[in-house]
């Protein structure tokens, strides 16, 4: 199937959509751009009327708070940013609530940190909450809980949060609204002739550092993070549509076939929801370095055995999420380690038959089982 046919079929059949909108779309120099917000809400109401469930991931709290506080307070450092978020979040939600109310739609606020999705029990609670809200035909409005999040509990940006929610709500489409017209084939800041790519066939094959100038250059929430989120969505089998968020009715025009944006195709071989959760529920706490033979075995679908390990980095415990890297430093996979780092250092390079003599009875033959590993993880 060609991508145009795929896109048309998905847009016609989509029944659950995660829409992400960032601060660059929602705000102007004077704070919240109410015209943009009103148009966004009107488009979501239109989709709602067609029977499409929508989860809205919305940034803008910090920017809205800054607009209120700038006359009296200087905002600098993380505590001030978190305080500005507290001021802005209530104003942002108040406006959303009124805007959706004008269309007869109930909105609901959900604030999350990584810790809320790290525990399988809390992950399932979150899933049930979203399901109940959508059964009531409400629109969940999600943001990272900036006020309480610390570095190790941050999603990093709302693009990452939105990609993880695809798995929570079983979405069949991811729409990412940006201040650009879509994804450019080259950096438009340095190449004025750069054009928007209407389709990305293989998002994993893109060199993001070249296209986006690297993560540092574009900053949190730039095109770099949007394409990383699209990579995760593609692994889950969910296509991504990147659209110009400040352009009036861009989503409705896209559903009508009149607004191209950039369509990111999903992978043909997708990962299970469980593996997706295992790989992305937490940040890796260490690394296991493997030889070329082990890399080939993993690519063939095998588990990682201690014999293929040539190095261990970090001080993680049993069951921790770790990176699997090649000798050259490339990330091959992430997975849950059957052994703490100290034990892995003792058994690395040894054959399975030797493990009992080194560590005692009842040892796992695998350092990381293939069922607990995700290849080509986006970390």
From Swiss-Prot:
Its main location: cytoplasm. Residues 285-362 form the PUA domain. Belongs to the glutamate 5-kinase family. Substrate binds at residues 59, 146, 158. It is found in: Cytoplasm. CDD domains: AAK_G5K_ProB, PUA_G5K. The keyword Disulfide bond does not apply. ATP binds at residues 20, 220-226. GO terms for biological process: L-proline biosynthetic process. Keywords: Amino-acid biosynthesis, ATP-binding, Cytoplasm, Kinase, Nucleotide-binding, Proline biosynthesis, Transferase. This is Glutamate 5-kinase. Its EC number is 2.7.2.11. InterPro entries: AceGlu_kinase-like_sf (IPR036393), Asp/Glu/Uridylate_kinase (IPR001048), G5K_ProB (IPR041739), Glu/AcGlu_kinase (IPR001057), Glu_5kinase (IPR011529), Glu_5kinase/COase_Synthase (IPR005715), Glutamate_5-kinase_CS (IPR019797), PUA (IPR002478). GO terms for molecular function: ATP binding; glutamate 5-kinase activity; RNA binding. Gene3D superfamilies: Acetylglutamate kinase-like, PUA domain. Disulfide bonds: none annotated. Pathway: Amino-acid biosynthesis; L-proline biosynthesis; L-glutamate 5-semialdehyde from L-glutamate: step 1/2. GO terms for cellular component: cytosol. It holds the Pfam family AA_kinase. Catalyzes the transfer of a phosphate group to glutamate to form L-glutamate 5-phosphate. It catalyses: L-glutamate + ATP = L-glutamyl 5-phosphate + ADP. The keyword Amino-acid biosynthesis applies. It comes from Oleidesulfovibrio alaskensis (strain ATCC BAA-1058 / DSM 17464 / G20) (Desulfovibrio alaskensis).
